[in-house]
């Protein structure tokens, strides 16, 4: 197979080469327009947007205007921000517009690149979403690129976590909306819980560009977005089960599977749990919930580690993001795991939540007509992007070749030997004033290393979830001569580490608002690094205040320049990895912090055989080799065999994690199909003022089901007319039905259906007429939405419990996923049937009194027994309207009986 691939590569070129060949001619077309754009006045350039929109309205495609649109953005960027898009950024923009992932190295200007595709697609008028990993980056990028969009007459909105409903609606109505993946996802869920179409904030899902796409679509893919409310279940069970765990003995009672991050009870362990709890059979059907919580408690104690997976702050268990090391305040583990951790740490246990709405990032982002992404590290996950999202990864070459030197890993036998070697390396780097970024995989490891450095008298900064408030300051100083910065994973990602430290003088220039020509020329000289000229301009200034401020800025530039030169001489930023991550991509992200835009830099990873990756997934051959070589303590090993073993271990873990994400998606796809049906039905009700045709179809179906259930066949003597009459009375529909009348007909069952259906429809129309058609329309929509939301909430709860216990079917050699699909479909079918029946029952029995008010918005019905009472506020027109009392019939929704269709 490899031979064939090599032959094809020689004939066709590599994928990288083929991709570039497709992009280069288009970049040539864009460049050919540059001279024309430079000669265009500001007013004509800003009018391009309207011209493009008119051409699109006439049927021209976005592809056909791409060269002109991209050339326009490049010229506007140069005029407004002094930044000209490089050719490689043009390539990135084309890749994004075509719905691909553009892999661009750190420092290559992904934010500026995105403006090309964002502007072009915004011309369609359907809204473009730019997705970032946090609020800070969303706001920063929007404000940073806003001058380009303002010049071109394109509106920009930003979604922030603390925004209210109206602010969000305004932001989404803009041509371009920046925000985080969480905010976009939660707003979608909330939009499908509103009571009026005007209360929705999002428009269509037309085009999205996801920044740090690997972080959002892969790292966070295992975490669904959930809107929940507290359930009525007690938290006592968590305390009770938590007390069991210390009594269980490892190996005898349970086995820890570190690879799968799971704990399995042995037969002896099952017996032990049964004995402690005083039950006969732990795996009896009624104990499925108990088994689930025992397993969650075991995981909480044996898999999840404090200061690695979570921290305890102010009496709360807070999740630590395994990929960035950031605290995820407000996020909770689902399925009772978070409660198990709270019980373990003896803090207040929050009630387990009940799902009201949920979606995974996979299914949310797959809704977009076109999806694109940017990152510095996507190629190692190209298969997953292609299979799950139908996204191709296009590797964009750097504008300036990477000069960073990546040294081979150094492997030690023990963690102590590794840390001793790291300490020695940091000492040496600091002695020659080379800044070093030390990457760790957990808060715990970062604090161990910090204590060692403090004991050795080495000044350093720590950037982890516990010190996130100082993140910007720490990252700003990480490039200073001799700076030592310890960071968990990719904390600080999204902010470049500048060699020599942050260029604070640029902020001073921006905040200095003065129209004086000398001040303007001074600023230009500083930005061009023409320091001698800047000094001359200071002497010409007529104000001592201005001279003082300018001198301070010039001095800070000189200090930064000296620091910058010292770091360049020392070799640039050095990356010191203290452990390999499970994914090669995360290691590459750490390395990518150094060597930006052609800067010098270096990197090396220090490993030990006690590291989790080596211990759990590594080969025993490495350990055997080091013992065989009789290596003295502290001696490292560098060999191709070791490097290959590490790469194989990482590939195994990546494959394992991909399987987990794929498996989760297969389960969520079941819910997604159901979600689509419910949301489509909900939107149909929101979009249409008159839903009478939908209600009439429900009535017809309800009548049909009752007749099939009680009056099957064409022999009236065998019919159960009493049960049918009881159902009709429940609808307050008094209808004379005599079996003798139907014996004379050609098709008795059809004749019965037509009579009952006609009477039911007439009753419905009479009710609408008596209450008033306008009030009735609003009333039936409100009632429909209330019942729909209630039934959907109940169904989600049932599906959660089904999923928790579905694994038990594996004991009878049935496929849990297949069984989940089958049972989930049956449950959904019943939920829809119950919804239709309940809507019909409510509408036939609703009572409306005079001199009260009907709301513009529905309010939730409060159920007491079988009565539902809702008090209404007022119509938007101010018309007085009634209080509504709704009583359901005792014949509520039941499981649908399988039946043949009636004959007509």
Curated annotation (Swiss-Prot):
Keywords from the UniProt entry: ATP-binding, Cell inner membrane, Cell membrane, Cytoplasm, Membrane, Nucleotide-binding, Protein transport, Translocase, Translocation, Transport
Source species of the chain: Leptospira borgpetersenii serovar Hardjo-bovis (strain L550)
Name used for this protein in its record: Protein translocase subunit SecA
Localization (cell): Cell inner membrane; Cytoplasm
Record-listed E.C. numbers: 7.4.2.8
Quaternary structure and partners: Monomer and homodimer. Part of the essential Sec protein translocation apparatus which comprises SecA, SecYEG and auxiliary proteins SecDF. Other proteins may also be involved.
Enzyme class: translocase
Residues bound to ATP: 89, 107-111, 496
Sequence segments annotated as region (Disordered): 870-904
Reactions the enzyme catalyzes: ATP + H2O + cellular proteinSide 1 = ADP + phosphate + cellular proteinSide 2
Record-level GO cellular component terms: cell envelope Sec protein transport complex; cytosol; plasma membrane
Family annotation (SUPFAM superfamilies): Helical scaffold and wing domains of SecA, P-loop containing nucleoside triphosphate hydrolases, Pre-protein crosslinking domain of SecA
Molecular function as annotated in GO: ATP binding; protein-exporting ATPase activity
Mode of membrane association: Peripheral membrane protein
Family: Belongs to the SecA family.
